[in-house]
């Protein structure tokens, strides 16, 4: 069963496979067509040879990359086979083993600096799976990665904080100067972004926030900021992220996040909660408790945080709506909001918070999780009946804590019960404050060093691309 979010899964299933469901990447053939025909033979080594009047010619294997799939209007299932090899635990272990061997043989030119970035949601998923406190879980996961050969193990908090700050600034600017692009839609969910690009294209893309997701902000920090601090070339760093959903693999593979200057991706490999569980099981670690703990690294400032697992009150997907609501209330209307009350609407995955002044609603925010609510919101937008200013929108029901690659429930527990426990655990964690010393240092020494906002725009923001569907006669069902 596919673990991609519902927004990316194939829904039109029947016995007729149309080109939109198959891989429809066109193959460019350089050779001219032969008027006399040709003969193709398979050699003993498995290669293909084409015999023509001009002689024998070895045929090259057709390769379709994940980037090709992202630029195609076909369904996302076409990419799953590629993901297995390019973004998998097998590929990660292969790289780690090769790197350890290069270190052992003193082949310094072949050694890469390996950085693991771990999101909050996988830590909570693993904590529930192995019945450990969240902070201890992170330390033992760090110990496991260190044993594999990791050089640094960091959390995503600094990238989460930057995403919140850039998101709030973008919202205030739109509210004051460009209200036709409201509601602003959160951009951290790659499942929703990919769905929007392929299904609704140029209509919906202006509404999506340009702020990068925390994963891709972290990619910039590791490959550009941290690389400079450590004196390491960006292409010598192998950056691994641990995320709660498979859609993050697609996000990391977008061409927007490949640097032509450094000739490398911001994120080289994405693995998920369930893959970490499989890796532990595969290495004979049946209980995370037996893994030796290791400290989480903090290269961003001199002051080390007291904890490394943080939470938000409103949602398990990063707290975008809660933080932006509080900031907008204070910045735009001079109202201090200590607690944002999100009320359920049609279902628990669609919630709303409002700010009123003199009996008038001046701010209306929503949290919309799951494909059903995404579709409803899009239809409201198209009919001009969407009166929200901001929507935290996630493809998975219940958001990122219930991501498609989170560890499955055991012992007869339902998915709903497990998700409720994860949400309660997330809300019990120390509240994150994005305005802190580390964030200020990154802005001062890196992003604002040039004296303007160009680096902020280049490194913390992105753009989206409508993907037109290819209509051919083969789409006709007889």
UniProtKB/Swiss-Prot annotation:
InterPro entries: Cytosolic_Fe-S_CAF (IPR050340), Fe_hydrogenase (IPR009016), Fe_hydrogenase_lsu_C (IPR004108), Fe_hydrogenase_ssu (IPR003149). [4Fe-4S] cluster 2 binds at residues 189, 245, 396, 400. Gene3D superfamilies: 3.40.50.1780, Fe-only Hydrogenase (Larger Subunit), Chain L, domain 3. This is Probable cytosolic Fe-S cluster assembly factor CPIJ010948. It comes from Culex quinquefasciatus (Southern house mosquito). One of its GO terms (molecular function) is metal ion binding. Pfam families: Fe_hyd_lg_C. Belongs to the NARF family. Component of the cytosolic iron-sulfur (Fe/S) protein assembly machinery. Required for maturation of extramitochondrial Fe/S proteins. The keyword Transit peptide does not apply. Keywords: 4Fe-4S, Iron, Iron-sulfur, Metal-binding. It comes from the Eukaryota. [4Fe-4S] cluster 1 binds at residues 23, 69, 72, 75. GO terms for biological process: iron-sulfur cluster assembly.
